[in-house]
Design a protein with these regions (language model features):
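Class I S-adenosyl-L-methionine
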Residues: 9-194, 198-200
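C-terminal target-recognition/interaction regions appended to catalytic cores
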Residues: 158-292
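N-terminal Rossmann-like NAD(P) cofactor-binding module of classical short-chain dehydrogenase/reductase
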Residues: 1-3
Length: 292
């Protein structure tokens, strides 16, 4: 299995003709070139597992995705793609990502790949993308990831100056029709917005309400940021969601430890994939494409 992620912006530079040569200068070209070399060497990857932002579907009016899919077809791969949301896989985060699963037609005789769209309360996989999907999946709350209140340093409570700045900026953006600004959540919120690599700067995309204590909002701690992506970072007062993944993988017993500075931890977690989504997708790849 060849896994990869790549930015879509470089496709805007050269213009598109929908083919392998047209991907030059992009990170996707490097992925495609590695695959081509493996094919030429007689050891083609059976499966390609690619991840990108949801916006890839509409980037350059869909031409970027068409070029990528045409390249996969040119290399001899059948494929399926769809957008999955982490909030349906047992983590309280609204994080949509586009996944492409491709299989080498000369080796893997599958006719299609069925995506998992969520995890049910009993741990089973949901394969139907229905309008009521949110009612069928494992329930979460933002407080599922919280560290004990008495263990959270005052460092994470934002300053008066920053809080006033967030509020003023949101007012201006709303008046200008931009719709951007801070997002405030509490312990009963079903899920948060998407955490990004820039979270370390001001935490504006996910702030935790502390008005009941007479305090300004706070940022997530690095541990909470990791848990939001599904990392099993153990702490006092927190339990790993039992049904987030019940497949009995050995990795379920692994505990993650943050060994980098706070800023780097935020950056890495913001750039990460949501672990439960990847684990469930990986299981489906094995069952549907590698075992047949």
């Amino acid at each position: 299995v060849c896994c990869g992620g790549f930015p879509c912006q470089p496709f805007s530079i050269a213009g598109l003709r929908r083919g392998f040569e047209d991907t030059r200068g992009t990170l996707f070209f490097n992925i495609a070139n590695i695959v081509k070399q493996k094919i030429d060497s007689g050891i083609p990857p059976k499966v390609l597992f690619l991840e990108n932002v949801k916006g890839l579907k509409t980037h350059m009016k869909g031409e970027t995705l068409k070029t990528i899919l045409a390249t996969l077809d040119e290399l001899g791969y059948a494929y399926n793609y769809d957008v999955l949301n982490a909030k349906y896989f047992g983590v309280p985060q609204n994080r949509e990502r586009l996944f492409i699963v491709a299989w080498y037609k000369d080796i893997v005789k599958a006719t299609t790949f069925k995506f998992p769209y969520g995890i049910a309360p009993d741990g089973s996989t949901i394969y139907e993308k229905s309008k009521d999907l949110g009612d069928k999946v494992i329930k979460t709350k933002v407080s599922d990831i919280f560290e004990p209140e008495d263990s959270i340093d005052s460092y994470y409570t934002i300053s008066d100056r920053l809080w006033i700045g967030h509020q003023e900026r949101k007012k201006r953006n709303k008046a200008n029709g931009k719709g951007f600004g801070y997002s405030l959540f509490n312990e009963n919120s079903v899920y948060s917005s998407t955490i990004s690599a820039r979270y370390w700067k001001d935490g504006s995309e996910i702030l935790i309400d502390q008005s009941d204590k007479g305090l300004n909002p706070r940022k997530l701690t690095p541990t909470e940021a990791g848990r939001l992506q599904g990392y099993r970072i153990i702490g006092n007062g927190w339990k790993y969601p039992e049904n987030a993944d019940n497949q009995n993988y050995n990795s379920d017993n692994l505990e993650f430890h943050i060994v980098v500075p706070r800023k780097e931890a935020y950056h890495q977690f913001g750039n990460s994939v949501a672990i439960p989504v990847i684990k469930r997708l990986s299981k489906e790849i094995v069952e549907q494409l590698l075992k047949i």
